[in-house]
Amino acid sequence: MTSNLNLMAPPRGWEAKYESDGGGVITTSVDQTVNWLLNWGRSNSVWYMLFGLACCAIELMQTGGPRGDLERFGAAPRPSPRSSDLFIIAGTLTYKMATRVKRLYDQMSEPRFVISMGSCSNCGGLFQYAYSVCKGVDQIIPVDVYVPGCPPRPEALLEGLLKIQEKIKSERALGRRGATGG
């Protein structure tokens, strides 16, 4: 896959223009440039934590192997929720396990993203009529990207990771941290 990112070209809005927000604060396009740079760095260093519950977790392991190579997109596995940006839930989620998923999600620092991988974690899948199965991870925590399939192919998970990277790039990093001009 090729990237259309040109690191040599400055981002849009680099021209020197000054705006006032009416409160006496003058913002320049430097804010936009720093915002672009922060989002570029965050989107290309996504650290994920896997919560594998069933056969979809095997597909994630295959994606992390030499053929899928998640690390070429900047994604690296982390064992702790405190050091991860992305939470990948793969497999059938039961109500008993849902409290642990919520606890792990709450331990992640902002900004945090979630990929629901496979039919079982998206909607309950084959086991959706069982009394103990949660009918989707989105009933417990907010989900950013759904990866369909039973089990999904490694390419589908890579596409989901690219969607997360696009979402990170479109955010406003400076405004979220309370800096001026945001």
From Swiss-Prot:
Family from the record: Belongs to the complex I 20 kDa subunit family.
NCBIfam families to which the protein is assigned, alphabetical: nuoB_fam, PRK06411.1, PRK14818.1
Enzyme class: translocase
Catalytic activity line of the entry: a quinone + NADH + 5 H(+)(in) = a quinol + NAD(+) + 4 H(+)(out)
Statement: the UniProt record of this protein carries the keyword Transmembrane helix: no
Single GO MF descriptor: NADH dehydrogenase (ubiquinone) activity
Membrane topology: Peripheral membrane protein
Task performed by this protein: NDH-1 shuttles electrons from NADH, via FMN and iron-sulfur (Fe-S) centers, to quinones in the respiratory chain. The immediate electron acceptor for the enzyme in this species is believed to be ubiquinone. Couples the redox reaction to proton translocation (for every two electrons transferred, four hydrogen ions are translocated across the cytoplasmic membrane), and thus conserves the redox energy in a proton gradient.
A Gene Ontology term for the protein's cellular component: respiratory chain complex I
InterPro entries: NADH_UbQ_OxRdtase-like_20kDa (IPR006137), NADH_UQ_OxRdtase_20Kd_su (IPR006138)
Sorted UniProt keywords: 4Fe-4S, Cell inner membrane, Cell membrane, Iron, Iron-sulfur, Membrane, Metal-binding, NAD, Quinone, Translocase, Transport, Ubiquinone
Residues binding [4Fe-4S] cluster, per UniProt: 55-56, 120, 150
Obligatory cofactor(s): [4Fe-4S] cluster
Annotated Pfam families: Oxidored_q6
Biological processes annotated in GO: aerobic respiration; electron transport coupled proton transport
Subcellular location, record wording: Cell inner membrane
EC number of this enzyme: 7.1.1.-
Quaternary structure and partners: NDH-1 is composed of 14 different subunits. Subunits NuoB, C, D, E, F, and G constitute the peripheral sector of the complex.
Signal peptide range: none
Name of the protein in question: NADH-quinone oxidoreductase subunit B 2
Cofactor note: Binds 1 [4Fe-4S] cluster.
